[in-house]
Amino acid sequence: MNGEESFVEDCSVFVEIDPSGRYGRYDEILGKGASKTVYRAFDEYEGIEVAWNQVKLRNFTRNPEELEKFFREIHLLKTLNHQNIMKFYTSWVDTNNLSINFVTELFTSGTLRQYRLRHRRVNIRAVKQWCKQILKGLLYLHSRSPPIIHRDLKCDNIFINGNQGEVKIGDLGLAAILRKSHAVRCVGTPEFMAPEVYDEEYNELVDVYAFGMCVLEMVTFDYPYSECTHPAQIYKKVTSGKKPEAFYLVKDPEVREFVEKCLANVTCRLTALELLQDPFLQDDNMDGFVMRPIDYYNGYDETGVFLRHPLIDDPLYHDQFESSQICEIDLFANDDEDHVDISIKGKRNGDDGIFLRLRISDAEGRIRNIYFPFETAIDTAWSVAVEMVSELDITNQDVAKIAEMIDAEIAALVPDWKNDTESSQNVNNNKNNNTAGFCGECASNGYIQETVSSGEKSHHNHHEFDSSEDKSCSSVHGRFADMWGLRESYSDDGEKQSSRKVRSGRWSENEMRRELRWLKARHKIQLMKMRGQTICETPIEISLTPGTSVSLPLLYRAISLPVDAVDM
């Protein structure tokens, strides 16, 4: 009995805890690369296991490009929200241990390559489902504005939860935002790199080529071009248009035709959207229950008989992909029938400072008040609206509409304010199954924290409001104070009753103004660090006002841009 208790106690001991106290890291290593180590960790708030990614900064003293790669991965993961893209939870810089830490979701079955090698007898129906999910993730990346190219798509970078058949794209360290018509850097894994990558002039279709190689890997259990012994041999074959030998071992004509469409010349190559509409990925005949044997790979003689089963109809993308031209996936759906009222009100606090309140109410009487500062010297309506959507996980409003409302209110308060929403990105409609955008319990909010661990008691930007006396809940996410409640009602005698206080005694406008100053201070601190010296072996002491946190995206921006280009 004592042995069992000792085992439980040992397994529950955290070797490290994040600054917020929410995530605890175990000593168990899930994976290890040249610079990054992934540990098993636990989310105490949600009661789920997560992946704790740790990158030692001392590994980059001679290779700052690799450091920027990891900052890029963290920055991109934070801004992405899709069911087929790896979820990002939080990140922080540990200045004492000189490490970057970020927490992502944990995949129970590892990578798709590992999973496929463990389960060799897989029906074509399952392969199709995996393909559809990967393409949906790619479509989301490519439909961003500007598009995002993964640049290193392979089964090693695709993860799966085997108990649900859920597939997600991860490892975005080499991903690039396509700000021009093409990218100009040769990166990736040679076996999965399209011919145009070697010419260093390419677009998002290189991911489609890599996806085709992934399909080939799924059905052949091996890397493409495994017959080559050196990257130079792969380069010669790829640039001369020769397909890998494994392609010719695929006997199923439909599989071969589908892969060939992915590997076609860039001028003829289909997009992720077009591949999703390809007949190969559509459901089989439900009436006939066609179950003919399939022998899709001739190079492995233990696969046995594969049966083609009818697929279940997946209506998720029927409405979303009616148009063949998509600039960016819309973040929210807001139909007229939702009866959602939105209003915004603000007041000036100084020359450049403005304090705003965005109020969202619905037909069921729920009210959401979002308080936030706006500094006209550095903020734009679009950037603040996007930040609000990302931080607060708003799912039922249009980011463009919010940006326009912010612009209009700022213009009313500042006569010489220049409206910026006309040049902002247009957003298309992406139906979202999340219904409310109102939290059920404050304790379970999926907020993102970015803090600096300094060895002392950590402070973070998540403040709980006192909601014990009313039916409301509130929290602070970065610059935003988020308050939920119910609309005022009237009793039988006509007396007005309110389900919540107008403002909590623990939160005031002064605190929001201090929060704005902290945000500005931490930005300047990062610029001073990057101007003064590069990251080195000696820990850097950072003295901040309690409640301050260093934002990884800000640090990433400071690294990526010339210091002189940033206005102090």
From Swiss-Prot:
Ranges for domain Protein kinase: 24-281
InterPro entries: Kinase-like_dom_sf, Prot_kinase_dom, Ser/Thr_kinase_AS, WNK_Ser-Thr_kinase
Keyword field: ATP-binding, Kinase, Nucleotide-binding, Serine/threonine-protein kinase, Transferase
PTM per Swiss-Prot/TrEMBL: Autophosphorylated.
PROSITE patterns named in the record: PROTEIN_KINASE_DOM (PS50011), PROTEIN_KINASE_ST (PS00108)
Entry keyword Kinase: yes
Residues at the active site: 171
Region of interest (Disordered), residue spans: 453-473
Loss of function: phenotype: Plants display early flowering and altered expression of genes involved in the photoperiod flowering pathway, such as ELF4, TOC1, CO and FT.
Any GO MF annotation of the entry: protein serine kinase activity
EC code(s) of this entry: 2.7.11.1
Binding site for ATP: 104-107, 154
Start-end of Basic and acidic residues biased regions: 463-472
Expression induction: Expressed with a circadian rhythm showing a peak before dawn.
Annotated catalysed reactions: L-seryl-[protein] + ATP = O-phospho-L-seryl-[protein] + ADP + H(+); L-threonyl-[protein] + ATP = O-phospho-L-threonyl-[protein] + ADP + H(+)
Keyword Secreted carried by entry: no
GO BP terms in the entry: photoperiodism, flowering; protein phosphorylation
Described function: Regulates flowering time by modulating the photoperiod pathway. Possesses kinase activity in vitro.
Family membership noted in the UniProt record: Belongs to the protein kinase superfamily. Ser/Thr protein kinase family. WNK subfamily.
Protein name: Serine/threonine-protein kinase WNK2
Record lineage: Eukaryota, Viridiplantae, Streptophyta, Embryophyta, Tracheophyta
Protein's gene: WNK2
